[in-house]
């Protein structure tokens, strides 16, 4: 969470509901970042990249990678993933009604490789920390 010296001219992204109801299995989302574009020998991108990935169900994510509900999994399609250098970058659910309606689902965390078939990346679930986030931004 950042505190700006002056108000931004850009509207902030919507935050998810605390109950996690914005996240459901197989929903399309978009991950963006400047990480490497090929793994393992790629270089960080000079331009912002994005790719559409599907969110996994909680049980499938836990069974595959042993994570709890403070995390979520997305991806698993060959060649489409976040990668090295993308940590902290956004996972966004686009609702199709313009940027003002998009929801921040997660922040890129970790994975085993990049863009491997049937192997998702793990994201910090924003809704898991939403009460804390809201308490900080209201100050």
Swiss-Prot record:
Q: Which cysteines are joined by disulfide bonds?
A: 61-73, 83-114
Provide the alphabetized UniProt keywords. Answer: Disulfide bond, Secreted, Virulence
Instruction: Quote the InterPro entries the UniProt record gives.
Output: Peptidase_S1_PA, Peptidase_S1_PA_chymotrypsin, Ser/Thr_Proteases_Immune/Dev, Trypsin_dom
Q: Which GO terms describe its molecular function?
A: serine-type endopeptidase activity
Which GO biological process entries does UniProt record here?
proteolysis
Pfam families per the UniProt record, alphabetical: Trypsin
- Name all Peptidase S1 domain ranges: 1-138
Name the SMART domains for this protein: Tryp_SPc (SM00020)
Question: Where's it found, cell-wise?
Answer: Secreted
List, alphabetically, the SUPFAM superfamilies matched: Trypsin-like serine proteases (SSF50494)
Q: What is its main location?
A: secreted
Single GO cellular component term: extracellular region
Known Gene3D superfamilies for this protein?
Trypsin-like serine proteases
Q: Which family does it belong to?
A: Belongs to the peptidase S1 family.
Question: What biological function has been recorded for the protein in this entry?
Answer: Secreted effector that suppresses host plant glucan elicitor-mediated defense responses. Targets host endoglucanases and inhibits the endoglucanase-mediated release of elicitor-active glucan oligosaccharides from P.sojae cell walls.
Q: What is the protein name stated in its UniProt record?
A: Glucanase inhibitor protein 3
Source organism per UniProt = Phytophthora sojae (Soybean stem and root rot agent)
């Amino acid at each position: 969470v950042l505190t700006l010296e002056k108000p931004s001219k850009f509207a902030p992204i919507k935050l998810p509901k605390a109950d996690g109801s914005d996240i459901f299995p197989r929903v399309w989302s978009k991950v963006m970042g400047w990480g490497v574009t090929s793994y393992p020998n790629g270089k960080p991108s000079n331009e912002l990249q994005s790719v559409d990935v599907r969110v996994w169900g909680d049980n499938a994510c836990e069974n595959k990678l042993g994570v709890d509900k403070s995390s979520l999994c997305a991806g698993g399609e060959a060649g489409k993933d976040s990668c090295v250098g993308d940590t902290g970058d956004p996972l966004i659910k686009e609702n199709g009604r313009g940027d003002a309606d998009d929801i921040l689902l997660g922040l890129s965390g970790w994975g085993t490789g990049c863009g491997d078939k049937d192997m998702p990346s793990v994201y910090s679930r924003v809704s898991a920390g939403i009460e804390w986030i809201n308490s900080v931004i209201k100050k």
